[in-house]
Swiss-Prot record:
Gene3D superfamilies (UniProt xref): RbsD-like domain (3.40.1650.10)
EC code(s) of this entry: 5.4.99.62
GO cellular component, one term: cytosol
PANTHER family linked to this entry: D-RIBOSE PYRANASE
Entry GO MF terms: D-ribose pyranase activity; intramolecular lyase activity; monosaccharide binding
TM ranges: none
UniProt keyword Methyltransferase present: no
Protein name as annotated: D-ribose pyranase
Annotated substrate binding sites: D28, H97, Y119, A120, N121
Pathway(s) annotated for this protein in UniProt: Carbohydrate metabolism; D-ribose degradation; D-ribose 5-phosphate from beta-D-ribopyranose: step 1/2
Classification via InterPro entries: D-ribose_pyranase, RbsD-like_sf, RbsD_FucU
């Protein structure tokens, strides 16, 4: 039994299996998961677990070289600032929400949280540790 880090077996296995350039999506509770894309559903109730703590856990174990969110999230300055701070030195990129949903088709998995904030979704592209 693991005693630290990500304990969810499917999430831990996903991160361990990632290769350079692989896409993982951390999503709010409303993002549609494209057919054929695995969904690791962590949502329990409205807001539980929330987006940022799940993202923090993933970032503690995943090498990220690129991160993208929807332009529609920009008015939520609190989340944008939180994301920018947690992702440093990786720069946060923006695309429209429809394009973000299209990108999800290429994801290795969508991690569904209980987040209730509109557009609280992020595309994380795996980097390499060397």
């Amino acid at each position: 039994m693991k005693k630290q880090g990500i304990l969810h077996r499917d999430l831990a296995a996903l991160i361990a299996s990632l290769g350079h350039g692989d896409l993982v999506v951390v999503a709010d509770s409303g993002l549609p998961v494209p057919p054929g894309v695995p969904c690791i559903d962590l949502a329990v109730t409205k807001g539980v677990p929330s987006f940022l703590p799940v993202l923090e856990a993933i970032l503690s174990e995943m090498v990220v070289e690129n991160a993208t969110v929807a332009e529609e999230l920009k008015p939520n300055e609190q989340i944008i600032e939180a994301l920018a701070g947690r992702l440093k030195p990786v720069q946060l990129h923006f695309i429209n929400h429809e394009s973000l949903k299209t990108c999800c088709r290429q994801a290795r998995a969508v991690i569904r949280t209980g987040e209730w904030t509109p557009y609280a979704n992020i595309l994380l592209y795996a980097g390499v540790a060397f």
